[in-house]
A protein has these predicted regions:
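Core segments of transmembrane alpha-helices
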Residues: 7-12, 71-82
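Alpha-helical transmembrane segments of multipass membrane proteins
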Residues: 15-20, 80, 84
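Transmembrane helix interruption/hinge and helix-loop junction motifs
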Residues: 21-27, 89-91
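Alpha-helical transmembrane segments of multi-pass membrane proteins
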Residues: 31-42, 75, 79-83, 101-109
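Juxtamembrane helix-loop transition segments at the membrane interface in multi-pass membrane proteins
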Residues: 45-57, 120-122
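Juxtamembrane helix-capping/reentrant segments at transmembrane boundaries
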Residues: 52-75
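Hydrophobic alpha-helical transmembrane segments and immediately flanking/interface helices
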Residues: 88-117
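Canonical alpha-helical transmembrane segment with a positive-inside/aromatic-interface signature
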Residues: 107-140
């Protein structure tokens, strides 16, 4: 297979996936970026700082990492479900609300990971995360 053919297939696949998710807009880009940041900071917390609350020893465990990837994958499947529901009713509200909710969850997790590393968190960001947590608790 030539590099041109490979690029064509990758482009077609990427376009199809983006279409399934309602487009590669800023919200979806932000969610994917935040998911990557959360996963990386989780690896740093466990691998470097050994302070992960996800494992008994606080260190890296492949099972904990795999669970994290599975959760993120299922989160994207939930976004896909929300997008398809929007397609049925002719709106974009459900997808947008779902993506924003997952962005909030990823933000909270990133801030928690930074705190476990001893990174000073600006007060404004801490307050914003507290508000997000309270709103998440109300919807549960």
């Amino acid at each position: 297979m030539s590099s041109r053919e490979l690029c064509t297939y990758v482009g077609l696949l990427g376009g199809a996936v983006a279409a399934l998710f309602g487009g590669w807009d800023t919200a979806l880009q932000t969610l994917v970026i935040f998911m990557a940041i959360d996963y990386i900071t989780g690896l740093v917390v466990a691998g470097v700082f050994h302070t992960s609350p996800k494992t008994k020893t606080g260190t890296l465990e492949s099972r904990a990492g795999w669970k994290g990837l599975c959760r993120k994958g299922v989160s994207l499947l939930v976004v896909l479900v929300a997008c398809r529901l929007d397609a049925i009713i002719g709106s974009s509200f459900i997808r947008d609300a779902t993506v924003i909710t997952f962005i909030c969850n990823e933000t909270i997790s990133i801030i928690e990971n930074a705190g476990l590393m001893g990174v000073p968190i600006p007060e404004a960001l801490t307050k914003a995360v507290d508000v997000l947590k309270q709103q998440a608790e109300k919807t549960e």
